[in-house]
Amino acid sequence: MPFTFKQFHVDDSHCGMPVSTDGVLLGAWAPLTQAKTILDIGAGSGLLSLMAAQRSEAVIQALEIDPLAAQDCQHNIDQSPWSDRITLIQADLLQWYPLAQTQAQTQFDHILCNPPYFDNGPQSQCSKRAQARHTDSLAFDQLLSAIKQLLAPTGKASLILPNASLGRFLPLLAEFKLKLSARVDITTAPNKAPQRHLLCLSHAVSSAESSEAIEAEHLSIRDASGAYSQAMVALTQAFYLKL
């Protein structure tokens, strides 16, 4: 379904996962200050790449494994004001990044990823949606290994995860000497339990540093009246048409 933002348009007709609040939250929140190079892992329709291009002057590489989703991504890039700064790569991350390390651009100032998150249970009947949503196609340890290798020494990686995945994801950081540098717990309304978590990762000096707790911020998407909260409006108003 086509989706129009303030400065760009997204057609996600062939993508396993359509434009979602998760993606918009991640694209609006990721700390891109001073990032000159950005990698978007699992770009899908190109939403995160386009949001990053609007928010920064960075050169962006959008990596997408699915050929049909990659077609949507390229179309959306071509129709945007930033086609000169976004390059689509149609490839499997696990096959691509070892080769990328032999080339000039081997590390990135920022990495964006809205990763697969269902790792058990029956997969969707739609194979594209299943691939986009299940960690069978990209396990967390594989993702973190790639981030570890591709992230510049002072770089950051931003992700969004559902609450059910957080307990499995965070203990893996120590294995790859990565640490949380920021976290926002997302609720749908006040006094609700968090359903999503925005995470920002950076390199850790030691495994012990990986395990250090940080204080999480909190964001409620809607207020008590059911309208978008002030915090949600402040975060996303540069993108959503009606805010």
Curated annotation (Swiss-Prot):
It catalyses: adenosine(37) in tRNA1(Val) + S-adenosyl-L-methionine = N(6)-methyladenosine(37) in tRNA1(Val) + S-adenosyl-L-homocysteine + H(+). GO terms for biological process: tRNA processing. Keywords: Cytoplasm, Methyltransferase, S-adenosyl-L-methionine, Transferase, tRNA processing. SUPFAM superfamilies: S-adenosyl-L-methionine-dependent methyltransferases (SSF53335). It is found in: Cytoplasm. Its main location: cytoplasm. Its EC number is 2.1.1.223. GO terms for cellular component: cytoplasm. GO terms for molecular function: nucleic acid binding; rRNA (adenine-N6,N6-)-dimethyltransferase activity; tRNA (adenine-N6)-methyltransferase activity. The keyword Transferase applies. Signal peptide: none annotated. Belongs to the methyltransferase superfamily. tRNA (adenine-N(6)-)-methyltransferase family. Specifically methylates the adenine in position 37 of tRNA(1)(Val) (anticodon cmo5UAC). This is tRNA1(Val) (adenine(37)-N6)-methyltransferase. It comes from Shewanella loihica (strain ATCC BAA-1088 / PV-4).
